[in-house]
């Protein structure tokens, strides 16, 4: 190979492929492949976005001060330990850059978010996957793979794409089993959807220990996926390290304004959460009545398993796509028999269930 050569491991990265946005020959689409909020953004966020239009020639506040204060107020956190990013993907990468590296290992759950191994390899570290138990993070399996080379453990809680979660006591046990030098990163992107009493998003662990970080996003319940806005709650030393490696103006003027407004719209947040519960419960019941396996989920999506049909999940995906329904095939996550289906509005989910019923008859 002539010319510049990428660092070791870069060409081993399988590029991340997001959910589809179009279907040839189809004009009306139901986009249920990327776990976007069914209600879209808060009207207050849209208004705030429009209001900053005349100011987009100005650089944003590099510290995202108002947004960090709004996050602190909304979730009862110290704003000094909150950092904002261009989507939570950015902080997942920066943590690997700052704390992993050549010779280090990064642990994650077998069916965890694909960004974890990508971030590890991009930093020159080695990703190590631990098996799951019943499509749920297995604490014992993760701890069994901790070595002197382990630098980071990524845990999605709740997990994408399985929809499962670790109860608070299991998450605490995972942390207790890690050496102090290993950083536990709790990716709580779907935390706002969880109503289970035994769930914890990780903020209590961050408050008590120096080796835990929790990350969150505005892309799901808050409906700001197109803004690319995420944040992290960190120990002071980790916050200092991230400040040193992040881009100076990594969160746009528009994203900061929309984020503050979205946080203040509590009625919209509750309506989004309630609608998701309604849609997920009804859709799960209908699809199970068709004879398909729907794995339990606490998120704004469900994982549907087609193995028992004796037909490929990809066939079902293509059938849905031809009807303008875009869902996500899970082969890249090691779940080739499954489709992940985002929860839309109730009428939309009825349409999806009807289409699956038609496919099963074919």
From Swiss-Prot:
Keywords: Amino-acid biosynthesis, Aminotransferase, Histidine biosynthesis, Pyridoxal phosphate, Transferase. Its cofactor is pyridoxal 5'-phosphate. It is an enzyme of class 2 (transferase). GO terms for biological process: L-histidine biosynthetic process. Pathway: Amino-acid biosynthesis; L-histidine biosynthesis; L-histidine from 5-phospho-alpha-D-ribose 1-diphosphate: step 7/9. Disulfide bonds: none annotated. CDD domains: AAT_like (cd00609). Its EC number is 2.6.1.9. The modification N6-(pyridoxal phosphate)lysine is found at residue 220. Transmembrane segments: none annotated. One of its GO terms (molecular function) is histidinol-phosphate transaminase activity. Homodimer. This is Histidinol-phosphate aminotransferase. The gene is hisC.
């Amino acid at each position: 190979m002539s010319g510049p050569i990428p660092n070791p491991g870069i060409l081993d990265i399988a590029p991340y492929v997001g959910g589809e946005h179009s279907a040839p020959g189809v004009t009306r689409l139901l986009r249920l492949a990327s776990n976007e909020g069914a209600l879209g953004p808060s009207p207050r966020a849209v208004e705030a976005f429009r209001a900053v239009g005349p100011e987009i020639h100005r650089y944003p506040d590099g510290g995202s001060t108002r947004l960090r204060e709004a996050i602190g107020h909304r979730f009862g956190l110290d704003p000094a330990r909150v950092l904002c990013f261009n989507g939570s993907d950015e902080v997942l990468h920066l943590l690997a850059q700052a704390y992993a590296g050549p010779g280090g290992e990064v642990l994650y759950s077998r069916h965890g978010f694909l960004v974890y191994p990508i971030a590890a390899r991009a930093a020159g570290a080695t990703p190590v996957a631990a098996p799951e138990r019943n499509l749920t993070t297995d604490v014992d399996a993760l701890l069994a793979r901790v070595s002197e080379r382990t630098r980071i453990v990524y845990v999605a809680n709740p997990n994408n794409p399985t929809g499962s979660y670790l109860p608070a006591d299991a998450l605490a046990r995972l942390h207790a089993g890690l050496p102090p030098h290993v950083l536990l990163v709790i990716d709580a992107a779907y935390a706002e959807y969880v109503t289970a009493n035994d769930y914890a998003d990780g903020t209590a662990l961050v408050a008590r220990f120096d080796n835990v970080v929790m990350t969150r996003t505005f892309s799901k319940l808050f409906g700001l996926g197109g803004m690319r806005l995420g944040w992290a709650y960190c120990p002071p030393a980790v916050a200092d390290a991230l400040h040193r490696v992040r881009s100076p103006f990594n969160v746009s003027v528009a994203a900061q304004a929309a984020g503050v407004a979205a946080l203040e719209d509590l009625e919209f947040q509750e309506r989004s959460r309630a609608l998701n519960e309604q849609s997920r419960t009804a859709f799960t019941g209908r699809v199970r009545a068709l004879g398909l396996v729907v794995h339990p989920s606490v998120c704004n999506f469900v994982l549907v398993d087609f193995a028992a049909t004796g037909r490929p999940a990809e066939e079902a995906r293509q059938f849905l796509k031809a009807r303008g329904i875009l869902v996500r095939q899970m082969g890249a996550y090691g779940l080739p028999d499954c489709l992940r289906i985002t929860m839309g509005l109730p009428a939309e989910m009825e349409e999806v269930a009807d289409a699956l019923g038609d496919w099963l008859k074919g």
